[in-house]
Regions:
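A short His-aromatic
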Residues: 136-137
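Conserved N-terminal segment of class I S-adenosyl-L-methionine
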Residues: 1-123, 127, 140-147, 152, ...
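Acidic catalytic patch
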Residues: 165, 199-204
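A short beta-strand submotif of the Rossmann-like class I SAM-dependent methyltransferase core
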Residues: 127-133
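Generic structural signal for conserved hydrophobic packing positions in ordered secondary structure
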Residues: 56, 133, 198-200
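Hydrophobic C-terminal alpha-helix "anchor/cap" residues
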Residues: 60, 193-194
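Short, glycine-/aromatic-enriched active-site segment of Class I SAM-dependent methyltransferases
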Residues: 161-182
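Short glycine-dipeptide loop
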Residues: 153-159
């Protein structure tokens, strides 16, 4: 039997902990316009996006070095950095990279304004992640994209790709539909990734729920690849 009464009667300690938070973050943080719009107008979508990163975080080890391709305004990379050794986030959008740098104070995250195809980092990463990126590329460019990602992956590393399913396209926002060049059926995505990794494991996602149910009923896919070719 746990007596919860012994834990909740120290108001002085509680107030000290609250004050410590306000001292550490006196001005809070200013989110990017994209996230501000989600919070004010579609907060469910904001939490679904975070749930995608939660799933990826569960795949990480504390010793992992992670490259996030398409890190945007940085929330996801900061999320992952709380579950691994270090995260390098890259994005071609300089405005979003500056937004990420503006809110981040974590020492184990770096943000770089860089095109993946021009990335010259010599180190290899334990995990390479790209969520909501491949659907913005043509099929030909997607091949180059996966090849570039695996070139930065350690031999025993893990590649994680997340993307909306083609079956979700009619229900996507106007912004998403305007920018999604190629959405995938799961077997198609598995075949594509199988050209670059030895083994793949697929998951489906609806709202915050990740599962292995019928892929045509899923709104989102994760494919995890192991053993680069």
């Amino acid at each position: 039997m746990i007596d919860t009464g012994i834990y909740n009667d120290n108001q002085e300690e509680y107030q000290k902990l609250v004050n410590d938070i306000y001292k550490k973050y006196p001005n809070g943080i200013t989110l990017s316009p994209e996230y501000a719009q989600l919070i004010q107008e579609n907060i469910l979508r904001f939490f679904i996006r975070l749930a995608r990163y939660k799933f990826v975080a569960k795949m990480l080890k504390r010793s992992d070095s992670v490259l996030e391709v398409g890190s945007g305004s940085g929330i996801g990379s900061m999320f992952l950095s709380q579950h691994c050794k270090h995260v390098t986030g890259i994005d071609v959008k300089t405005t979003e990279v500056e937004e990420a740098k503006g809110i981040n104070i974590r020492e184990n995250v770096d943000f770089i304004a860089q095109d993946l195809f021009e990335l010259t980092l010599e180190k290899k990463f334990d995990v390479v992640v790209s969520l909501d990126v491949i659907e913005h590329l043509s099929e030909q460019k997607a091949h180059q994209f996966l090849g570039a990602q695996t070139s930065h992956l350690a031999d025993a590393g893990m590649l994680i790709v997340g993307t909306p399913s083609i079956y979700s396209y009619p229900y996507q926002s106007a912004l998403s539909q305007a920018s999604h060049v190629k959405c995938y059926d799961l077997p198609e995505l598995l075949e594509l990734m199988g050209k670059y990794v030895q083994r793949t494991i697929a998951f489906s996602m609806n709202d915050e729920l990740v599962h292995t149910g019928h892929h045509k009923m899923a709104w989102y896919y994760f494919v995890i690849g192991f053993g680069k070719k």
